[in-house]
Regions:
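Functionally critical transmembrane alpha-helices in membrane proteins and complexes, commonly lining
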Residues: 13-77, 99-101, 128, 137, ...
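Membrane-interfacial alpha-helical segments at the cytosolic side of multi-pass membrane proteins
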Residues: 25-30, 69-73, 110-111, 171-186, ...
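Transmembrane alpha-helical segments and their boundary/interface "anchor" motifs
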Residues: 15, 57-60, 76-113, 123-133, ...
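Alpha-helical transmembrane segments of multi-pass integral membrane proteins
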Residues: 111, 225, 230, 253-374
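Interfacial loop-to-helix transition and helix-capping segments at the boundaries
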Residues: 10-13, 49-60, 124, 128, ...
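Solvent-exposed interhelical
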Residues: 171-198, 233-252, 345
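Short, Lys/Arg-rich, polar N-terminal cytosolic tail immediately upstream
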Residues: 1-11
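Aromatic-anchored segments of alpha-helical transmembrane domains
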Residues: 24-31, 111, 196-206, 258-269, ...
Length: 386
């Protein structure tokens, strides 16, 4: 068996920048930043670029691929070093990383926020099922709730839990993934990825007419995680794959980036048929996996993103930023539009809203990471594989 690339390197220094960019696309989608810019820029190619990077779905899909890559890489390295996978320790590490902040946000959304709404003379009930969120099944709750919204025409899903569905899918992935590699013989590992990618594509094809299912359902997006995992597997087990990414030239990398971005920007023209949903996601997520692998292992990268220190530092707070930014956005909206009574349609007000929401989210994310998440992360380290 070939040796893994940079076997002792568990922290990938160039990925924190990408984490923040993925978060920012989600943030941009929730603040309508893309619409704000597109309405003021009348250059088609620029607007297409803005559209791609202001769609929350782009960032969420990238997060899935990144999680699949990192978790699979760590599991396979553990198997290489120790000859087994300690499933219990894996679960404990994931619980200590995900649950504390996740359940704090749930507490705020379902217990504290309703009282705030009453103070603001807004007594609309929260339509979501708290038990689905507590049990990490909120992606199915979102499907049901949005179906009701489509029938009634009333949109009242609290923005604070607008991202919980993706965390639920990640947790479902964490539950299943280590068991597969602990129980299935090593010689069959590559088939795990192939089978899951195939099943996910077939599921999307069968449900191609239902955009809610193809966007929120676990089976529809599991291929994202599997593709990230497959690239991690090949990074460790394929000498040919390793050498390709080590030796790929700058101009070749540039070509892939241009092609990948073009597909993302002009996908609606390239894939006009509704049947294309079955495989078009595989193409975009393979591009995301290429970016991750190229940044980690290429010796001729056009630029290593970890050199951009400020954004890289912000990337360390990404989990908190991702979960908390809806609260920051809502807080700023309440202050600007409910309390100060500013005009939502004015350009200056919209700029203040977007910039303030980002700053507030970063501040809350920093506080959360430093004073709330870090103690759990230190405890998590006790369950790392030695």
């Amino acid at each position: 068996m070939s040796q893994p690339i940079k076997e002792n390197k568990i922290y990938f220094e160039n990925l924190d920048f990408l984490r923040f960019i993925a978060f920012f696309t989600v943030f941009a989608g929730h603040t309508a930043l893309g619409t704000f810019l597109i309405n003021r820029i009348h250059v088609d190619v620029i607007n297409k670029f803005i559209w791609v990077f202001s769609q929350g779905g782009t960032g969420v899909s990238f997060f899935f691929v990144l999680s699949g890559f990192l978790i699979t890489y760590l599991l396979l390295i553990e198997k290489e070093k120790t000859g087994k996978i300690n499933v219990r320790n894996f679960y404990v590490r994931r619980i200590l990383r995900i649950w504390p902040l996740y359940y704090l946000v749930i507490l705020f959304t379902f217990i504290i926020y309703p009282k705030v709404k009453v103070l603001l003379n807004n007594i609309d009930p929260i339509p979501n099922n708290i038990w689905m969120h507590l049990s990490f099944l909120s992606n199915f709750d979102i499907i049901n709730t949005e179906r009701k919204e489509m029938i009634t025409g009333v949109k009242n899903i609290p923005v604070m839990i607008g991202v919980n569905w993706s965390i639920a899918i990640e947790e479902q992935f964490y539950l299943v993934w280590p068991l597969l590699f602990a129980l299935i013989p090593k010689k069959f590992y590559k088939y795990i990825f192939i089978v899951i990618i195939f099943i996910s594509a077939i599921f999307r094809y069968i449900n191609r007419a239902d955009s809610l299912v193809t966007y929120f359902h676990t089976l529809a997006v599991f291929s994202d995680l599997a593709i990230g995992g497959f690239f991690a597997y090949l990074s460790i087990n394929s000498e040919t794959f390793q050498q390709f990414f080590k030796q790929i030239k700058k101009y070749q990398i540039a070509i892939v980036y241009v092609l990948g971005l073009s597909i993302l920007m002009y996908g609606n023209f390239i894939y006009p048929n509704k049947y294309d949903i079955a495989y078009m996601r595989i193409i975009s997520t393979t591009f995301f996996a290429f970016i991750i692998t190229e940044q980690n292992f290429s010796e001729h990268s056009i630029y290593k993103l970890g050199k951009i220190k400020f954004i890289t530092q912000l990337g360390k707070y990404t989990y908190g930023l991702y979960l908390i930014h809806p609260i920051g956005i809502q807080a700023v909206a309440i202050v600007l539009y409910k309390i100060l009574k500013l005009n939502e349609t004015q350009t200056t007000t919209q700029l203040i809203y977007i910039c303030s929401a980002l700053i507030v989210s970063i501040i809350i994310g920093f506080i959360s990471y430093t004073y709330y998440e870090t103690p759990f992360l230190k405890l998590k380290n006790k369950f790392e594989t030695k």
